[in-house]
Amino acid sequence: MMEAVAVAAAVLLLLHVAARVADAVWWRPRRLEAHFAGQGVRGPPYRFLVGCVREMVALMAEATAKPMPPAAPHNALPRVLAFYHYWRKIYGPTFLIWFGPTPRLTVAEPEMVREIFLTRAEAFDRYEAHPVVRQLEGDGLVSLHGDKWAHHRRVLTPGFYPDNLNRLVPHVGRSVAALAERWRAMACAGGGEVEVDVAEWFQAVAEEAITRATFGRSYDSGRVVFRLQARLMAFASEAFRKVLVPGYRFLPTKKNRMSWGLDREIRRGLVRLIGRRSGGDGGEEDETTTELKDKQDSGFNDLLGLMINAGVDRTMPVEDMVEECKTFFFAGKQTTTNLLTWATVLLAMHPDWQDRARREVLAVCGDAAGELPTKDHLPKLKTLGMILNETLRLYPPAVATIRRAKFDVTLGGGGDGDAGGIHIPRDTELLVPIMAIHHDARLWGPDAAQFNPARFASGAARAAKHPLAFIPFGLGSRMCIGQSLAILEAKLTMAVLLQRFDLALSPTYVHAPTVLMLLHPQYGAPLIFRPRQSQPSN
């Protein structure tokens, strides 16, 4: 009797689980398709389990199989977001796609974007990234939610105040000047010019700045750890390419084992470093410390110090500090490297703007024979600022971002229950295609796919027909905390290089922007650097 009851219970449990699974992967997607279709929102049909992923992968593979046409080098949207470009022509700017059985509503109208990130932000949360992505970016500010995110943001924000970042300028400037001197020597030995893949070399500049910002007086120890993190990123990036292979990250392949070992070593190194700094035993007085005290005043707030001193009532746990350090390294390095890469490529493509930017740099900062650009020079480089903004418009580091509805909500109708809005059920994901908004001719005019920094002459808010048409670092409370550091690094680096070199595209350069988490050149960015003759400063 008891045996029969147990069997019946097991059968009922199995039927219950089967019904839940069937609802999740079949009936719920069908209901949601009908729900959105009833509001005029359509999209490619849902396919059992895989959703639209197969079509998305095919569209992206076809688009990236060939480089950009020379006649329209900056019309990158059809290549970079091929699925969006293709389906938008069929379904309009707001349509429904499926990532497996998960619905994603694409939203590219600025007023709806305003609601998602500003006026209705409490209804949306950042979606949970894939574990491979989280291994790359760390479990820090980028992925945290709720009170923990708010606490971390509050603790770390002083590290990105302008006065604090300005103290990094001499260090970053010397790092870039040293890099430029290496290129000059290579050019002199190579007949007056040198070919450089800036996509690789700029990583060193970005690493220098983010290591200084994160570790301050513990720079040397932090640099060792971050070099391990750079190796880990290479392995994790390869794993990300196989993200659609179920369970791949758990397989004990040689590279996965090396990746796991590096992750453990990084954590041990950061824990030791945090322990020394927390103990205040002076153990971090390495060879860099005296230099930092001489050249970077004691008022500098490095991010590690801010976390250690997070407050007596709510000290940040060591594990949280470790994750934040990983986040700083990934986000700080990749965002700045990509911005610098695309900016130099664009100046090499457009020598007229390169000449305008150089004239401004020489007028404000002097030439390479004088002092390096200072914190007082950087705000005066208006043309360079316009060029960087146009770079971020055409080639934003993150081409899209995703939010998740925490509860049922209405967008576009002025509030829940209002006619004309789109009713969005809880757990629906919303994909905001940043690059598509940046390339929308309705917002930017008929030259939206052309390089024209002059559109930013009156500031970013007035560059387009809508003030929220330019969102390279996101919007609202979760806007990228490090955007000021990225712009400072980019301005300073470009100023130093323009003082010293003329830039041109290498004959081997192939214009092929592509996405692997962030936007980067698929075949690298080889450029020709020709040293300039120093002229007397005015």
Curated annotation (Swiss-Prot):
Additional notes on this entry: Plants overexpressing CYP734A4 show a dwarf phenotype, characterized by abnormal leaves with stiff, tortuous blades, undeveloped leaf sheaths, no flowering and bear seeds. Over-expression of CYP734A4 causes an important reduction of the levels of the BRs castasterone (CS), 6-deoxocastasterone (6-deoxoCS) and 6-deoxotyphasterol (6-deoxoTY).
Cited InterPro entries: Cyt_P450, Cyt_P450_CS, Cyt_P450_E_grp-I, Cyt_P450_sf, Cytochrome_P450_Monooxygen
Name of one Pfam family that matches: p450
Reported induction: By brassinolide (BL) and dark treatment.
Sequence similarity: Belongs to the cytochrome P450 family.
Topology in the lipid bilayer: Single-pass membrane protein
Main location: membrane
Biological processes, Gene Ontology terms: brassinosteroid homeostasis; brassinosteroid metabolic process
KW Transferase (keyword) present: no
The protein, known as: Cytochrome P450 734A4
Location relative to the cell: Membrane
Cofactor: heme
Molecular function via GO: heme binding; iron ion binding; monooxygenase activity; oxidoreductase activity, acting on paired donors, with incorporation or reduction of molecular oxygen
Phylogenetic lineage: Eukaryota, Viridiplantae, Streptophyta, Embryophyta, Tracheophyta
EC number in record: 1.14.-.-
Keywords assigned by UniProt, alphabetized: Growth regulation, Heme, Iron, Membrane, Metal-binding, Monooxygenase, Oxidoreductase, Transmembrane, Transmembrane helix
Job of this protein: Cytochrome P450 involved in brassinosteroids (BRs) inactivation and regulation of BRs homeostasis. Is a multifunctional and multisubstrate enzyme that controls the endogenous bioactive BR content both by direct inactivation of castasterone (CS) and by decreasing the levels of BR precursors. Catalyzes the oxidation of carbon 22 hydroxylated BR intermediates to produce C26 oxidized metabolites.
Designated gene of the protein: CYP734A4
Gene3D superfamilies: Cytochrome P450
Residues that hold heme according to the record: 480
Protein's UniProt keywords contain Lyase: no
Family matches, as CDD domains: CYP734
UniProt GO cellular component terms: membrane
UniProt tissue specificity: Expressed in roots, shoot apex, leaf sheaths, leaf blades, internodes and panicles.
Annotated TM spans: 5-27
